Amino acid sequence: MKKALFAALSAVFAGCTTIHTADDYHGTGIANGEKPIETVEIENTAWLLFKCIPLGSGDPNFPNEFGCKMFSNTLTLQNNLNMLEKEMERVGATRIANLASRKTDESIFFILLTRRAYHTSAVLLK
């Protein structure tokens, strides 16, 4: 019973890392003649106790999988940029347009439990 409870709590409080892409531009180009390959949205989340003690965070080495790091904090802007570089290599992109990043915090029970996320988005160009 204790193992099942621990597994359930781990699943609830685990962070995750996701990469969403869209690549259907219907022939649309950019003003300077470059061709967009895909739009990328990267999210890395973590759960924090008292806004500073990491309970679980997404594993940037395994996006879109249930790869989480318990009791460690992988929630950095640099990790999001590293995932973006890997996606650029995967699709053969040479440039980036409209790069944007933001951090969000959602507190539950005041400051007891916080879900923090870094979001990074960009258009990859050829």
Model-found features: residue ranges?
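Sec-dependent bacterial lipoprotein signal peptides
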Residues: 1-16
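Bacterial Sec signal peptide processing site at the extreme N-terminus
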Residues: 14-31
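Short secondary-structure capping micro-motifs at structural edges
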Residues: 24-28, 83-85, 108-109
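Short, exposed beta-strand-loop hairpins at the edges of beta-sheets
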Residues: 109-115
